[in-house]
Amino acid sequence: MIEKKSAAEWLQPPATNADSPTPEPSQPNSRKKIPPILTLWKSPRLIAAFWGDFVTATVMVSFDTTLTLFVSHTFQWSSLQGGIIFLALLLPTFLGPLLGMAADKYGARWISAIGILVMIPPLILLRLVNHDSLKQIVLLCALLVIIGLGAAMALTGLYAEYSKICDSIEAEQSGVLGVSGGYAQSYGISEIAWALAGLIGPLVSGKIYAAAGLGTLGWVLSILCFVTVIPTMFFINH
């Protein structure tokens, strides 16, 4: 049996120290967190990747506008033949896994920069295709394959760069891009590049083609690629 006096002593709550500071209720953080999308746009690497993505996409969609018209006028091809020639431009895309291995090994900067450089000579040489002959058809197909290869190289490196940018930002400021790390938003920025290219590219390329032909369009696109190599070399994968 426990006496009432002893039980009262055990049940009595412990005394608090009057001198100990009372914890204050936590105050909400008055500083507003910057949205992850704005944090991404502050990165020079992302801007360089976005520009390279936009230029490469512009090159590709420019052929969507002009190539069918060109082969119809120069080679008197049907719509079916005009569609088939796009295989030359798109077949190098199937090398994507191999190009991805190269990007993982040597870095996105080199694979992207080399890809953009690869597109320049065949774009300039498009002016050599100017009449109907088998040799001219073979030449056009060869030039398109090289352009497609360069575009596949550039895009493979640039797509890898988007995720690496997120990793780099998170390594410096953990949690700044949110729980998911900002990957989806960075890929969304890539989609913006393609949307702008799809909007601007056909308008500009169609205007140039109508005024001066495919050769001049190739020159304009090659200059655009040459300018793009500079930010790619200086900012991608840095």
Q: PLM ranges: what are they?
A:
Residues P44-L87, P92:
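Extracytoplasmic gate region of multi-pass secondary transporters
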Residues F54, Q136-L155, E161:
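Hydrophobic core of transmembrane alpha-helices in multi-pass small-molecule transporters
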Residues L95-A108, L126, Y209:
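Helix-to-loop junctions at the C-terminal end of transmembrane segments
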Residues A113, L117-K135, M233:
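C-terminal ends and interior cores of transmembrane alpha-helices
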Residues M153-L177:
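Intracellular juxtamembrane helix-capping segments at the cytosolic ends
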Residues Q173-A211:
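A late C-terminal transmembrane helix in Major Facilitator Superfamily
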